[in-house]
């Protein structure tokens, strides 16, 4: 998890792009983790959980079939390896290596630590003008990822926000100081998310936190919604309707009636992906082949690329290499068969979380909220960049809670016991 925040020194494209393979420190660490899990399984130290095998095997199989059926197998091979890494090998390694609640607590604690570190650095960037450029000023918080991965920091901080929210809900059990400390941490994370100016992360986080609060206490969810609305009105009043944060928030409401160029490009990419799937409904055009078919199916309104700028990487123009919708990306590149594999995996995790639900267990709350965040975020974003490995780790952690842990010790400091069998 810590390696995810190590700067890669170069731009990366989303999963399924045609810009080559970007290997990050997180990828190297994940390879070591997968190798360690494989050695333990081969030596008989740990056994492959049957439920996890049945959840991940269909996705691996459909990825293999759609890759073999690709018009350009050589191009699709790297995409196959990447998708298997993120959606199969890394989560499965986490399921195999996490033994009990203490191990699961270490995973979530490391995510929280990374998120707080990125948040503090992002806030410093925004306040000192060292962030990514937006509106001609370098005030957008991007953390250690830089403008070339402009969405990465908001995802990491969003994941950390989910973890700390779950811990904050059970904080009263651990002393009077636990609640203000948790609230202070949430304040830091929330400020960084606002300064990241990521509309997609705001929407997905609102849905995930809303689900978490409703599951924990419906009355608390209502009070939290009222407080957030009041704080929003105060913020708008203080900013006088100006400022990048208010403008980005207002652009969410205007994304249908008056979309900006970014949203308009997204609509055109969605339409292109839909047309590709219509012509290749079963196995798609092959993983990583969306860019090769994009211009054939997209309208002339589509921009030639997006612009990024920051003091470290300078000005860069990046081509639009994916539809910015994971579901449409899967349908266009892997067809209905590929989507069936992903639905099987995510459905197994959701069903496992439902059957082992315990709204008083922070680990269950994190697993459910992360899954909701992912499902909502995939509606207008796709997998890409250095946060892929972190997503795979958290998917594995959610699967641990969904499928049951191998050992069930009593709760350690700061942990709450729940149903895991």
Predicted regions and their residues:
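Transmembrane signal-anchor hairpin modules in multi-pass inner-membrane enzymes, especially those
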Residues: 1-65, 102-109, 168, 176, ...
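Alpha-helical transmembrane segments of multi-pass inner-membrane proteins
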Residues: 60, 105-137, 145-215, 348
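A conserved mid-to-late transmembrane alpha helix and its immediate loop/hinge
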Residues: 190, 306-351
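Interfacial juxtamembrane loops and adjacent helix segments
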Residues: 256-263, 288-327
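Loop-to-helix entry and N-terminal half of a specific, functionally important transmembrane alpha helix
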Residues: 321, 325, 344-345, 350-380
